[in-house]
Amino acid sequence: MNVHYILIDDLNPEHRELSICRCGTVNRVRLGDDCYRTYASLRIDAHDYAALFHYGVIEACNALPFLSESGNSLDSWDEAFLYRTHLQELATILEDAAGNMALQASETILLGWQDQPTAVAYLRSIDPAKTVDFLEKLALFVWESEQGGYDLEFIL
């Protein structure tokens, strides 16, 4: 079988349109509000989205009681909420993950594949330094949210 390998390039608009090229958002919300309101947001780009799963950060975060529509806690293609009472724990998980990742080497990971109509493997280069930078920004966003009495919504 011939397999075509595609290394995802975020600068290529055709690659950004692929369903395997996922992004996300973390929103600062108050679950007790009468109506839904977003107070601030932090975007998760496609590189960091893939890295969060690859390095096990999402899995580590699932030790916390995320509320999700699917019941799968924090997972891809889902929306999940975390109450403010757990934000300090979340920030600690993120800071620990950043510390563990700092010495990792860049690598190319398999995002997914398809068999039909043509066999294609989708790959992505992961730069741990970029991911550490994102985790530090996310941890700061979490700390600021906790200090302001906000809850968090993850749209993955």
Can you say where each PLM-predicted feature lies in the sequence?
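Acidic (Asp/Glu-rich) sequence patches and key acidic residues
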Residues: 1-148, 152-156
